[in-house]
Each structure stands twice: as structure tokens, then as C-alpha cells.
Amino acid sequence: MPQHDQLHRYLFENFAVRGELVTVSETLQQILDNHNYPQSVKTVLAELLVATSLLTATLKFAGDITVQLQGDGPLSLAVINGNNQQQMRGVARVQGDIPDNADLKTLVGNGYLVITITPEEGERYQGVVGLEGDTLAACLEDYFLRSEQLPTRLFIRTGDVDGKPAAGGMLLQVMPAQNAQAEDFDHLAMLTETIKSEELLTLPANDVLWRLYHEEEVTLYDPQEVEFKCTCSRERCAGALKTLPDEEVDSILAEEGEIDMHCDYCGNHYLFNAMDIAEIRNNASPADPQVH
């Protein structure tokens, strides 16, 4: 059995091409746990999670990537945020009834794929592409073609392992500033495309690579753990409250007796009463009653 929730990087010794392989289960489950999504939406989030993990692994700096789908369909928003430490979180917004077998275009409608790269130091970059492909992988390949001009292929699979949702994916990309032959890249892509969901989700990474590339020389590097981690905090909520007009905050307190701020990503609730608000306005740190 593979060790799920790990990202593996690998390199072809005889080609200027690098690869990534990721499988997720527990991380995906934690993203889905706090919501009652239709099956088709769960599948989209699973694919987004895999894609975001693969994309963050391409970062050459400390920072994060947000990959989101937005459109005028019943799935108005699906977003996964991850950083270079492979810490992931995600959420979707759904309206109306959605069939379990709805495809991407039916779910999102007329929409866009938005990729936001935020370095810890430096300027933020955002790329937007229309949802012209039939799959998320095809849309992401279009993004790479337009933004980085690096030949890139993604292969994403979803399924279940031991009765729990799981997903996996592989990325192939020509190395920057290298003269990879197009036929070499196409050859490796054809091999990778043969990977089956069951193989990717149930076999160890080295077995997957052997099945796909046993005639090639491949170096597999040490894995990186993938985990769910939400960045919400009481301090961040307090900072958000501080930006609201006093009259609006006071009105909510008068009606409700306290302010309940809910994190869509992890389900945490942060409660603020009148004394907390007074402390926020005086730049003090409020006490920390957090409700899960």
C-alpha cells in the first residue's frame, strides 16, 4: 500500500523532463468533512487539491498558490489554497440541486480558472484562463502554455481507498532553459497517461514509476508530507472586525449579544462579546474562546 498524503518528485536522467506524483486521502477527507457536498462537487475538490499540490511543488520560493474555479453554474466557486510546505485547505459554494454525475462544464457553467501565486517576499501574480477544456487538467495545461510556455502535462485520478475518498495525480514538465525534444516529452506523456486510478491510489510511488517508466532511468527523491492546515485564527478575525464600522459591529452586538465568525475552510467558530470588541478597539488581544 502507498503512503498517502505525500508528494514525490522525480527526474528523468536521459531527458530534460521532471515529474511529480501526489496521492491524498486524509487531507481530502478533512476538507470534505465539514460540508455536505454532492459527489460531483467532491470530485472537483479532489481534483483541485491534487492540482494545487502539484503546482505548489513547482514553486522555487516560500509562498502559496490558490487555485479556484468560478462561474455562473450551480458550483459558483471551488477553491484550494496551498503553500510550499504542502499545507492545504479548500471550500466550495454550491447552489441548487446538482446531479452526482455532473461534469465540470455543467457544474461551473461559463467560468474561469484563476491561479494566484503569492510569494512571502515579492509581488503577487495572478493568471486567469477560460474553462475551454473538458477537464481541470486540460484547463491547467492551457494555463501553463499561456503563462510559462513550458510544455506541461497533468494526469489526475480520483476514487476510493478502503471506503474513503482518495485522489492522485502526476505532473510532467520540461525543465526550464533545457532543450528537451518534443518527441521525448510526448513519449513520456503517453506512458504517464496509461496510469489507472487503482494503480495510482494503491501502489507505492516507486512501483508506479516502475510500471510506467521501467525502460527509463528515473531518480525518485524523498517525499514531502501533504496535510490539511487552516490559517484562520482569532487574531485574524479580530483584525477583520477592526476594519468594520463601529456602528455595524455595535448593531450586531445589540441584536445577537455576541458576534460569531465562522471559518468556511475548517468549520471553526470565533465568538466575540462586547468586552472583546472593546479590547479590540483598544488594540488589546481578546481572550481566546474558540468553538469547534
Swiss-Prot record:
Gene3D superfamilies, sorted: helix hairpin bin, Hsp33 domain, HSP33 redox switch-like
Keyword check for Zinc: yes
GO biological process, one term: protein refolding
Keywords, comma-separated and alphabetical: Chaperone, Cytoplasm, Disulfide bond, Redox-active center, Zinc
Disulfide bonds: C230-C232, C263-C266
Modification comment: Under oxidizing conditions two disulfide bonds are formed involving the reactive cysteines. Under reducing conditions zinc is bound to the reactive cysteines and the protein is inactive.
Major localization class: cytoplasm
Gene Ontology cellular-component terms listed: cytoplasm
Top-level division of the source organism's lineage: Bacteria
Coiled-coil positions: none
Role played: Redox regulated molecular chaperone. Protects both thermally unfolding and oxidatively damaged proteins from irreversible aggregation. Plays an important role in the bacterial defense system toward oxidative stress.
Family per similarity comment: Belongs to the HSP33 family.
NCBIfam families per UniProt: PRK00114.1 (NF001033)
Protein's name according to its UniProt entry: 33 kDa chaperonin
